[in-house]
Amino acid sequence: MKLKTLQLQNYRNYESISLNCHPDVNILIGENAQGKTNLLESIYTLALAKSHRTSNDKELIRFDSDYAKIEGDLSYRYGEMPLTMYITKKGKQVKINHLEQSRLTQYIGHLNVVLFAPEDLNIVKGSPQIRRRFIDMELGQISAVYLNDLSQYQRILKQKNNYLKQLQYGQKTDSTMLEVLNQQFAEYALKITLRREHFINELESLAKPIHSGITNERETLSLNYLPSIKLENKDKSETERLEEVLTILNDNMEREKDRGVCLYGPHRDDLGFNVNGMDAQTYGSQGQQRTTALSIKLAEIELMNIEVGEYPILLLDDVLSELDDSRQSHLLSTIQHKVQTFVTTTSVDGIEHEIMKNAKLYRINQGEIIK
């Protein structure tokens, strides 16, 4: 898939711009705080109907405006389609081919993106929340079913946590409701756990050879899914696995009542990375951690193509300067002539690669594109 054009109205520091995008590499050059990252963010927001930088949509609206609008014309192997997102101070509206979508699960997945920013280099050494978010962002784009299951799970999790707090403070004494919530909770927890497990296995199979290539076969990468609810026997039927999840939840019900919070479930999952059999988070050097992050991102691109039949759009937000020449070269060689890419940078000096010959450059200054 390719983004042919991008139009912004009243988005962040952009009053009104229209961008004709290059099908290969688009480089956004400018000093800091001019709007380069805002433009990249708008593409991400158009894809996922939310920003990766803020949970408050109002911040996306230009300071003197009542609304913001993002519109992109996309080309696929099978045709073309516009996507539109309106953001007001009361909410947001998304459209596919000019038709409003009542549910975000119907919308997400029509524009797939992979974001690689400096903070993504922390996927190895950062918090479990960062790794869970990475999993959910990938799976949510390639599987509407997963996105719906995750939404239902989060709804039930919120209900369960509220009820546990009420029990803790003596506002409720009937545990029957908790048993009902546990049944619903277990069903979605199992679906999410199994889908994440499959995803991690697929991602590992792609990341291993990539990591080996970057390190000239000196290192071997392995991924380790660390579910909060550990299922012992993988040969059991889904019904038996559901009973296993319920048993774990029921066995720990008193602990959860005492703590007033849900202690088990996919919201507490984690993902481990091993390099040459050693935990990369604890023992990996900064170089190994960065190579691991790069390998995972490149594997993410390939997996998305396998799952949906289209390469995603790659957003590189000031990350090339964070990579040494070898890793930078490997990244650019991998995406060349294959993945439409948007790059933000303060300068193209130091980007020595053939890919630059066909790149389209845009100079960004105070929310405007300077021709």
UniProtKB/Swiss-Prot annotation:
Pfam families: SMC_N. It comes from Staphylococcus saprophyticus subsp. saprophyticus (strain ATCC 15305 / DSM 20229 / NCIMB 8711 / NCTC 7292 / S-41). It is found in: Cytoplasm. The gene is recF. GO terms for biological process: DNA replication; DNA synthesis involved in DNA repair; double-strand break repair; SOS response. The RecF protein is involved in DNA metabolism; it is required for DNA replication and normal SOS inducibility. RecF binds preferentially to single-stranded, linear DNA. It also seems to bind ATP. Its main location: cytoplasm. This is DNA replication and repair protein RecF. Gene3D superfamilies: P-loop containing nucleotide triphosphate hydrolases, RecF/RecN/SMC, N-terminal domain. InterPro entries: DNA-binding_RecF (IPR001238), DNA-binding_RecF_CS (IPR018078), P-loop_NTPase (IPR027417), RecF/RecN/SMC_N (IPR003395), RecF_2 (IPR042174). Belongs to the RecF family. GO terms for molecular function: ATP binding; single-stranded DNA binding. Keywords: ATP-binding, Cytoplasm, DNA damage, DNA repair, DNA replication, DNA-binding, Nucleotide-binding, SOS response. The keyword DNA repair applies. GO terms for cellular component: cytoplasm. ATP binds at G30, E31, N32, A33, Q34, G35, K36, T37. PANTHER family: DNA REPLICATION AND REPAIR PROTEIN RECF.
